[in-house]
């Protein structure tokens, strides 16, 4: 059975990190050897770039600069972590991948989706086999304040209107890529969310 490349996406505070860890545990119990990773980050170089991106003033970088930084981090992540794991037969489960850049920088910060897609085509080219979009009311997500516990709150500081645009952007991506993107109700109980995700992934494994 070939390995799966799975990404979890969604607005800030939607519970992606928790559900990424639960999915990895579920796959491991079923005898698979998943690698859990995240973006920006997932490799030594990408983690260094992460600190530049997620900390500090909201206006620290222009949208164009963010696109280049995220892509540089993603390329290092892909070369040093994702591709080697997949080549060795391991599933990869990542908390965010290229869809986040499509939405955060491409759709909400100056309509730069075309630039994002051109750079992605040249430098990345890879897409997950399966993307799970955790969807919830941005007001509820912001009230959780998950990023603030770590100091990685730069994008939360853009406020509610920005998060509402993000939600709409992720919903639009699900319509654009229906074969790989699945929307999951992230306002449900964490156990119910995990069950929904496991059902979707289980179906994909059965098809492999």
UniProtKB/Swiss-Prot annotation:
GO biological process terms, semicolon-separated: dTDP biosynthetic process; dTTP biosynthetic process; dUDP biosynthetic process
InterPro entries from the UniProt entry: P-loop_NTPase (IPR027417), Thymidylate_kin-like_dom (IPR039430), Thymidylate_kin_CS (IPR018095), Thymidylate_kinase (IPR018094)
Catalytic activity reported: dTMP + ATP = dTDP + ADP
Pfam families in the record: Thymidylate_kin
EC number: 2.7.4.9
Residues at which ATP binds: 10-17
Role according to the record: Phosphorylation of dTMP to form dTDP in both de novo and salvage pathways of dTTP synthesis.
UniProt similarity note: Belongs to the thymidylate kinase family.
NCBIfam families in UniProt: DTMP_kinase
Protein name as annotated: Thymidylate kinase
UniProt gene name: tmk
């Amino acid at each position: 059975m070939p390995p799966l490349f799975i990404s979890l996406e969604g607005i800030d505070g939607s519970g992606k990190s928790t559900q990424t860890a639960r999915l990895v545990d579920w796959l491991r119990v079923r005898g698979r050897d998943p690698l859990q990773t995240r973006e920006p980050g997932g490799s030594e170089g990408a983690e260094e770039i992460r600190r530049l991106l997620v900390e500090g003033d909201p206006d620290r970088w222009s949208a164009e600069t963010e696109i280049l930084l995220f892509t540089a981090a993603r390329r290092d992540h892909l070369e040093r972590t994702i591709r080697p794991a997949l080549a060795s037969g391991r599933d990869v489960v990542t908390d965010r991948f290229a869809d986040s850049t499509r939405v955060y920088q491409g759709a909400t910060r100056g309509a730069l989706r075309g630039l994002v897609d051109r750079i992605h085509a040249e430098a990345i080219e890879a897409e997950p086999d399966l993307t799970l979009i955790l969807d919830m009311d941005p007001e509820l997500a912001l009230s959780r304040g998950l990023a603030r516990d770590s100091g990685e709150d730069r994008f939360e500081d853009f406020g509610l209107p920005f998060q509402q645009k993000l939600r709409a952007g992720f919903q639009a991506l699900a319509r654009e890529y229906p074969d790989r993107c699945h929307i999951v109700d992230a306002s449900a109980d964490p156990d119910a969310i995990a069950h929904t995700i496991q059902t979707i992934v289980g179906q994909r494994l059965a098809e492999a």
